[in-house]
C-alpha cells in the first residue's frame, strides 16, 4: 500500500463482543495493507492474554494465513506501534524480544490453543 497505515486485527474483541462483520481481510490483502494482530487484552471486551490464541483466532475467524498471523504479531505489530526497524525482526542491530517455541514449523504457532509451547524468552538484548 502507498500508506504507512497498519490495519490492526483484534480477534479476541471480535469473539467476546459477538461481532458478526469480519474484517475485509481479502481486500486488505489485495491492497497490500499491512495487518497486525493483537490481543487487546482488557477485562471488558477482550479477556485474552495469549498472543498464540489471538493468532489462532485471526486464522480461524478472519481467514488470515498462519504466515500473515505471524507477520501480524511481529513485523506489522512493531510497525503499528511505531517501533519498526528495532523490533519485530531478527537481524543484526535489532533489539531482541524473542520467544523460542517448541514447534517444528512456524504455522504451529497458529494451531495450538490452550497449550504452552514456549521454550524460552530472550528479552532486551541487541542482536549481533
Show which residues each predicted segment covers.
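Sequence-level detector for tyrosine residue identity
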Residues: 14-15, 87, 111, 119
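C-terminal cap of metal-dependent C-N hydrolases
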Residues: 73-75, 79, 95-128
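Active-site-adjacent C-terminal substructures of enzyme catalytic domains
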Residues: 1-86, 101, 127
